[in-house]
Each structure stands twice: as structure tokens, then as C-alpha cells.
Amino acid sequence: MNPLSRWFVTALVAGFFASSGLAQSPAVTIIDDAGKTISLTKKPARIVSLSPGATELLFAAGAGDRVVGTVIGADAPEDAKKIERLGDANALKYARLQALKPDVIVIWRDMTHELVLESLQKLRLPIYQVSLRNFDDMPRSIRRLGQLAGTESVAEVAAKKIEGRIAALPKRPAAKVAETTPELFFMMWDVPLYTVGSRHLMNDAILRCGARNIFDDIDFPAPIVEFEEIKKRNPDVILMGAPPITSRDWRERWSQFPAVTAVAARQLINFVDIRLTRMGPTAIDAVPALCEQLKPMRKGAPRR
């Protein structure tokens, strides 16, 4: 076969593969953060992310330009603000989501209500679940998202940088929390009373800052708790995650319960940083300021 004929045959074969779809990106099979195996016929070109934290992680993994839909609150990085909003995590525009024709839906497993998950499953679209218990889980999650999107090299660079940033944070206690460690209640909202459990990055941040979350025995990111249970657990510190005017109202309400150690010791402090509640890579940068706020706090501190 002469060179010209060989070139013609090669071009013809390549054209056949392209037209038949066999030249598409290879299939993807991956285990997500929840341990579920996800299989896609090709690397996803269109991703819907139903969590602000998951959206931030996708950008870190190099897949931000694939995200065609997300939820209210997905404001980081800056480019995420340009993505179409599909409502919030518990009030989604399902018809619009389906119209976007995503190759995969990325959710934050522990922050997605079971009814929402059931509704998503009815769409018969692949669902990838993100799940972080602490900061140390974050680099691994980014690497997995890189494998999902086919952006492994970008994800690896980002994961290594994040490992360095996490290493610079105060360390978690290696053993059981010391008796002198102040016990803290984080008041995320008042009606209903939302706090954080062991599956929230704020729980990890509190530990790294030298305190202990009084609800760290709840294996859930953001549980609703009863006021009587808070009084029973009697925190040394109450950390309020609300704007100044709202936290002032909360402080006034707490003043009616002087039997609570934190109230008697006047260890009620306000700390608002959306990065920690969003739970993406920027949450790492919020930890030093939290530690600074908690530094003066101590267990059973006397009234000042």
C-alpha cells in the first residue's frame, strides 16, 4: 500500500470511530466518598452540583467549568457565582435540573434530605456523593472528584497544596480530650435549634482550637437539638454563628439561664464565617480566626 492510500484508510477509520461515538472519552467507574460505585459511559462534560461545598471542591479539582447548575450559597470561588441556581438543597427545581441534561449529579450526602435523594433517584441520573468528616478527608475527596472528571493532574496539585494548608493548622488531640478542655455549644440557628455534630468541619475546627463540641456524639453534620438537652450538657462556652443583631437577641435570651456555666462565666461569643459552614477548601482559612476567638475561653471559668 502506497503512503497516500495508507493515509486515506487511516483517515477513513478515524472518521468511522468518531461518527460511531467510539472516539468519545473513556468510560468512568469510581467509588465515591460514601463508598458507592458510580459508572458513567464517558467522563462527565455536564455536572450539576447540589451543595456549595461540593461546588467549591469541584472547582479545586479542576472541574469547575463543567458545572452547569448549582444551588443558592455556592459563592466560591468567584466563578461559581456565574452558574445557574436550581434553588436550595431542599427546594430544588427538578424540571430545570433535568432540562440541563447533566451527565452526573454531585450531592453532599450527609446534608441531603432523604426525600430529596429519593426525588433525585427518580430522575435516573448518576449521583456522586461527597462526604467529609474532617479536614483531613478533603484532599482525598478532591482527588476522587478529579478522577470522576478526568482532571487528575489538576486535582493532585490542588490536593497537595491543601494538605500543606491543613498541616499548618493546630493539630487535633491525638488521644481522649483532656479534662481541662472547655466544652462548647455551637448555636447555628435558634428556631429550630441547629448545631453541628461529628460530621461537620466546624466540629473538627472546634477540636483543633482546643475545645470540644458537646454534641460530637451525634453522627450527623447539622442536627436539631432540644434546649433542655443543651442545659443538661451544660457547656462552658456558647459560640453563636449569627449576624451581630441576631446574636445580641440570642445573648439576651441566654441571660435568663444563669445556671448554664457559659452564661454564668459570660463566655458567649459570636463567630460568623460562611466559609466554615460551606465546608469547601476555603474553610481551612477560617480556622485561625476561630482559634483566636476561643483562645481566652476556659473550662468552668469564673464570672468576670
Segments predicted by a language model, with ranges:
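Boundary at the C-terminal end of the N-terminal hydrophobic targeting segment
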Residues: 21-27
